[in-house]
Structure formats: structure tokens, C-alpha cells
């Protein structure tokens, strides 16, 4: 009886840890179908509900009283319907929404209302410039949005269970609750190894490398390095760790903020052939 109770508790904790609601904003890039299939496969692995959102702006034709709102809404819904017809949704519950407004505002609202655990982002939602890693829209989501963690999925990437995550940060101080939940969920589901790389930069402060018990319970190995930026630390240690997912932290002046002020991020500045998990601000 005691063993059955223990199994019940373990299974209950496992279910609590798993991500339940995922959000995918879609654009018009040629990678959208591939990205959406990845999102469905990811959701299936977690038994999660998938929200697919296409956001459109409202315009009034100059010199007329014609409001294009209803036309754009209809076209957006038709676009979503066409997209979903090209996807194998498997057993995943998929909710599609055509919503008007500014991208960041809409996604923040949806995240709150639907209790989103993770946003899956393609590098270029609308951009066709091959020199760009993160396009204007995707970069804006990563840099400006206050909300859940994001997963940047490389173009054409096929879903597979995560085995090894390299987590890089220059400060391990955590003051907010639940920011590590996506990592805990990945670890609970895939039993993946998580290596923590603490990067000492010229802006290092006393206590930055104090790893609390919560973070210690998530990671399997901790190492330190000294580099000018967190990004350079990742480059230096990437091959020795050979991860199949990177994990960084979104901060006001963090990994994606300091080096590039514009929303667009060029491939010459940063690119990744594996998914990048961007956690919410820790402080």
C-alpha cells in the first residue's frame, strides 16, 4: 500500500512539472509549416494544449472611410485554416486564433489568459533575409515581451527528445518564482542532462556564482569560465559540452540585449543550429 502511494505521489509531481499550455505565433515565412509541426510534436510529447496565433494589424485605407479590420480578420483565419491543413496534429488539442493588435501586447495578453508555459518561436517570422538569425518580429518577442520562457527553434528543425542542455549565465541569483519551471519540465520528461556554465565577465559581482538549492537540484554539473560576455563563454565551451539545446536568461541587459540594440539579430553576431531556451528574468 505504501509503495502504491509513493508511486501515486511521484506520478502526480511528474504531471505537475510538465508544461500544459504552449503558444506558437505564426507569420508568413517559408519555415512556418515546419515550425508548426515541431510545435505539435513538442506538445504531443508533453500532452500539452497548443495555441496557434496569427496577429494582424488594423489599417484604414488613406482617403477613405473603409476599415479593413473585417477583411484582415477573415484573411488571417483563412491563412490559419490553410496552415493547419498541412500539419499532422496527431492527438494534440490545437486552438487557432486570429487576433489584432501589436505583437508583444497580444502575446502578453494571451499568455496571461491561457496560462502559457512556453512560447515556441521561429527565428524569422516574416523576414526573407538569409543574413538574419532573429527577424524583427521574433527579436521583438525575445527582447521586449514580459512573459513566459521562449524556445527559439532553428528553421527546418525536427523535434526529438532533448538529451543534453547547456545553460549559460553570468549571475545565478534567482529572486522570482517558477522561472526554472521549463527546465524542470524538460528534465522530468526527457531525463536530460543539464550542465550549468557560470561565466565571469568584467561586470561580475560578489555572490553572482552563489547557486541556490533550487538550481542545484536541476543541474547535473557546474563549471565556470572567464570571458568578456556570456555569449563568448558559450562559444568557448560549446564543443566540449556538445549540447542539443542551449539555455540562456532574458534580462534587461542580458544575453540578447547588450550586444544588439536593434530587434533584428544577424547571423554574423549570433546563430544556433540547435534550439535555444530563453528563460524569463530571474530577478
Question: What is the role of each PLM region?
Answer:
Residues 89-95, 216-221:
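A short helix-to-beta-strand connector/capping loop
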Residues 108-158, 240-241, 245-283:
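Gly/Ser-rich helix-loop-strand patches that form or flank binding pockets
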Residues 228-239:
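A short, acidic, amphipathic alpha-helical segment used as a generic capping/interface helix at domain edges
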Residues 17-65, 164-224, 243-245, 271, ...:
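Small/aliphatic-rich secondary-structure junction motif
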Amino acid at each position: 500500500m505504501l509503495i502504491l502511494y509513493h508511486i501515486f505521489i511521484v506520478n502526480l509531481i511528474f504531471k505537475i512539472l510538465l508544461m500544459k499550455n504552449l503558444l506558437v505565433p505564426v507569420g508568413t515565412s517559408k519555415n512556418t509549416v515546419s515550425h508548426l509541426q515541431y510545435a505539435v510534436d513538442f506538445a504531443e510529447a508533453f500532452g500539452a494544449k497548443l495555441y496557434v496565433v496569427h496577429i494582424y494589424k488594423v489599417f484604414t485605407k488613406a482617403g477613405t472611410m473603409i476599415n479593413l479590420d473585417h477583411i484582415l480578420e477573415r484573411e488571417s483565419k483563412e491563412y490559419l485554416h490553410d496552415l493547419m491543413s498541412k500539419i499532422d496534429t496527431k492527438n494534440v488539442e490545437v486552438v487557432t486564433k486570429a487576433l489584432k493588435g501589436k505583437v508583444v501586447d497580444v502575446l502578453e495578453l494571451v499568455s496571461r489568459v491561457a496560462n502559457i508555459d512556453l512560447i515556441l518561436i521561429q527565428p524569422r517570422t516574416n523576414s526573407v533575409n538569409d543574413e538574419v538569425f532573429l527577424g524583427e518580429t521574433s527579436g521583438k518577442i525575445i527582447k521586449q515581451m514580459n512573459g513566459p520562457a521562449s524556445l527559439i527553434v532553428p528553421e527546418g528543425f525536427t523535434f526529438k527528445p532533448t538529451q543534453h542542455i547547456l545553460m549559460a549565465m553570468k549571475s545565478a541569483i534567482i529572486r522570482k518564482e517558477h522561472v526554472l519551471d521549463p527546465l524542470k519540465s524538460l528534465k522530468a520528461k526527457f531525463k536530460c542532462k543539464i550542465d550549468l556554465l557560470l561565466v565571469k565577465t568584467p561586470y561580475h559581482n560578489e555572490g553572482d556564482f552563489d547557486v541556490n538549492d533550487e538550481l542545484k537540484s536541476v543541474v547535473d554539473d557546474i563549471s565556470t569560465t572567464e570571458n568578456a560576455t556570456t555569449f563568448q563563454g558559450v562559444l568557448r565551451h560549446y564543443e566540449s559540452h556538445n549540447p542539443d539545446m542551449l539555455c540562456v536568461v532574458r534580462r534587461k541587459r542580458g544575453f540578447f540585449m547588450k550586444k544588439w540594440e536593434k530587434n533584428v539579430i544577424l547571423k554574423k553576431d549570433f546563430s544556433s543550429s540547435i534550439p535555444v531556451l530563453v528563460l524569463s528574468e530571474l530577478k
